[in-house]
C-alpha cells in the first residue's frame, strides 16, 4: 500500500477575519474547519515580494503555482519588466528594436496589444506606456493600440480610467491611436472558445464589428447596454469618414505586451500559425514578420520573445521524479496548466513517473451559473486513483473558489466554497485511510473578498494570507512561511533531500 503525500491547492481560498463580503467565512465548511482545529496549521504569505511580485501586488494562480512548485521565490515577469524599464534595459531590448527597425524600413505600422489595466496579473499598462515612449523616441509614426479591457483583475467598470491614462501618454509622446477595443472575455479566452477569439481577430484585421469614433464612446455605449469591461464586444474605432483608424496588414509588426502566457496563447496563435485551422480567417491573413511576445507564451506560438524564460531547475516535480517516486497532477481545464506547466517551472513535458489527469470544465458562459464546476468529477477520479495505490505524490487543484470568486457574487461563491469543502473531505479521508498525509493550502485569495466596502462586486484577487494545514499530529509548524516553503516541507515529509536550488525553508520546525 502506498502512503500518498498530497498537496491540495484550494485555488482562491484566502483567510480574512471580517465576515462581510467574505464567502470563505460565511460558507458552511465543516471539513476545512475540522482539519484546521484538529491538525497543525499556520498561514502563508501569497502576494507581493514573498512571491516575486512588487510590494503589495496581489498574487495569482500562475505566480502561486510557480512559487509552490519551485520551492523558492520566483521573480515574476511583472517585476522583471519593471526593473528593465527602471534600469534603461527595456529600450535596448533586441526584439523591440528589431520590430521598430522593420516598420521604419518598410513604412508599415506597429500594433500594440494586450490587457489595458494595472492589475498586474496578465499585463501592466505601464509596459505599454513604455512601448509608446520607445516608439516616439525611435521615430515610429504609425502606432496603433488594440486594447483588451479587464474588469476581472481590477474593478468591473474601470476601463475609462485606463483609457484616460493612455490618452495622457499619447498626448505626452505624440504617438499612438486606439484602433480596436475588446473585452478580455473575447480576446483572452483560454478554453478553446474560438468563436470569441474570432470576433476579436476580425475586428483587428478586417475592421469588422461595432464601430465608434473613440474608445470612450465604445465604453459608454457598452455600459448603457449593461455590458461591462470584461464583456465589451470587439469593436472598431473609426475616423470621421467611418473608415477604421487601423487594421493589421502585411509587414506590420506586433508587440503583445501581456506577460502571462495562458490567456495570450490563443489570440497569438491566430496571427502566428501558418497552418491555423481553428476557424476560417478569411481571405486576408496578414503576414507579420515581427510578432513579439513579451514572454515565452508556448511552443505553439511562432513569435519572438522579448523576455526569455529563466530556467527553473530542480522543481518539486523533478526532485520527486529523481527520487523514483510516482506523482499525479490533477485538475479541471481552467487550472490544468497551473498544476502542470506552471508547477513544473514552465516545463510542458512530464517528468518520469508523472501522470496527469485532466477533467473538462463545464461549458457555461460564466461559472457563477455552475459554482460546483467539475469538482465532483475531479474528486471521483482522484479518490479512485488513491484507492488503487498508484501514486506517492499528488498535486491537486480545486478551481472553484477562484473561478466563481471572480464573479463578485456572494451566493454562487459561497456555493463554490461549500462544494470545495465537501470534496476536500472526500479526498482527505481517502488519503488518511491509506495512512497518507495531506497538505492543504491555497495559491492566493479571492473568495474571501467578494464585495467592496461600498457593496460593489469585488472581482479581483486579494492580498490576504492563505491557509496551510498538515494532517499529521506529530509535527509543529512555524509562522511567517511563504508559498516557496511548501515544496521543502513536502520533501521533509517524504524524506527526500532538498536541492540547493530550492531556497525555500521547510515550515516544519
From Swiss-Prot:
Q: Is Phosphoprotein among the key words of this record? A: yes
Please share the entry's free-text remark on the cofactor.
Binds 2 manganese ions per subunit.
What cofactor is needed? Mn(2+)
The record ties this protein, via SUPFAM superfamilies, to:
2,3-Bisphosphoglycerate-independent phosphoglycerate mutase, substrate-binding domain, Alkaline phosphatase-like
Listed pathway(s):
Carbohydrate degradation; glycolysis; pyruvate from D-glyceraldehyde 3-phosphate: step 3/5
Q: Which Pfam families match?
A: iPGM_N, Metalloenzyme
Which InterPro entries does this entry report, sorted A to Z?
Alkaline_phosphatase_core_sf (IPR017850), BPG-indep_PGM_N (IPR011258), Metalloenzyme (IPR006124), PGAM_B_sf (IPR036646), Pgm_bpd_ind (IPR005995)
Q: Which HAMAP family match?
A: GpmI
Similarity comment text for this entry: Belongs to the BPG-independent phosphoglycerate mutase family.
Please report the name of this protein according to its UniProt entry.
2,3-bisphosphoglycerate-independent phosphoglycerate mutase
Show the taxonomic lineage: Bacteria, Bacillati, Bacillota, Bacilli, Bacillales
